[in-house]
Amino acid sequence: SSYRLYGLIGIMICFGLFTFAGLSFLNDGYYSKFEKPNEIYKLMCGNKIGRIVDYYAVFFIFLSYTVMIAGAQATAVQHFNAPKYVGGAIMAAVCILVVMLGLGKIVDVIGKIGPVIAIMAIIIGLISILMNMDKLGSSLDLMGQLVDSGKVKVASSNFFLSAGSYVGFNMIWLVAFLAEVGNKAKSLKDAEAGVFVGATGFSVAIFIMSIAIILSIPDLYDSQIPVLVSAGKINPILATVFSIFIMLGIFTTSVPLLWTVTGRFFDEGTKKYKTFTLIAGVVGAVIGLTLEFDSLVNIVYVVNGYIGMVLLAWMIIRSATGKAKKQRMEAAQRNNIEFED
């Protein structure tokens, strides 16, 4: 949103890069049939660098957990007027307890609200656009002034780098997941169609929310959770309901993040697993409670986004030189799978 109309070009770049990366991970998983999803790093980068990237991905996931805790704190303070640290501390305590006790099924059940949150955010964005359509010119001017004054932070110096960084940090989350989706897919074409539809839907949602934020910037620029302010402008009850859904969404995201970090080093249920979960959960909570949510997002996601861009650049080179295709053909032959060019 801070790049104004240039941000729309950034969204198109995001769509192209998300589609490319998603299809790449999917195809690697489909043909290679990894025993463990993280083996994709070694395929893409070689054994030594792949191992480094694998451990870095775990570190990034830990940092993402800290961002979730900061987000819980920001939501609790902004909408529920909770004392500082209370919302984030409660969220961290519940997440640590759930991971230590292995109550992942609770997350599986509540996790089904994810699409509801996305749909609600899109609806709020559309209503906000309709309510503020006549403010486009003045809102664009104000956005430029706020960016120039530093009151609105930008992730990168230009929209192209911002788009690449955004795809980069999301990509680190999605690598192993999409490789596993490809591994289990019965039809490669159906799985590829799913990636395309997902990238399209995600990009449309970004477009809607970006326009909504620009049009409502006079009310949102000093808010850590802008969509909550937009919801409140529509109806206070809607904002409360959406806040609850956000907190549940943060919970269902934080638990798998913390579980992934601990599970990478220790077997679930062991004493070391529980001890490490407690330590990692508390350290992550301290970081999340100490730094402001918007500042933490700009630090964690932007820095990791640039690192993800390096991996993305290597993937493009790997595809352009034909190395990716060669590896998939060899894997298809090894696993008795018909290669689809």
Predicted regions and their residues:
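Hydrophobic, membrane-embedded alpha-helices of multi-pass small-molecule transporters
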Residues: 1, 10-11, 57-61, 65, ...
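Hydrophobic alpha-helical segments and their helix-loop junctions in multi-pass secondary transporters
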Residues: 95, 99, 117-148, 312-329
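Membrane-interface interhelical connector segments
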Residues: 39, 147-152, 213-236
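Transmembrane alpha-helical segments of multi-pass small-molecule transport proteins
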Residues: 10-16, 53-58, 78-102, 119-121, ...
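Extracellular/periplasmic helix-exit of transmembrane alpha-helices
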Residues: 21-27, 131-135, 165-166, 197-229
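Transmembrane-helix boundary/entry motifs in multi-pass membrane transporters
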Residues: 2-7, 30-61, 78-84, 227-242, ...
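Extracellular loop-to-transmembrane helix junctions
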Residues: 2-24, 193-207, 302-310
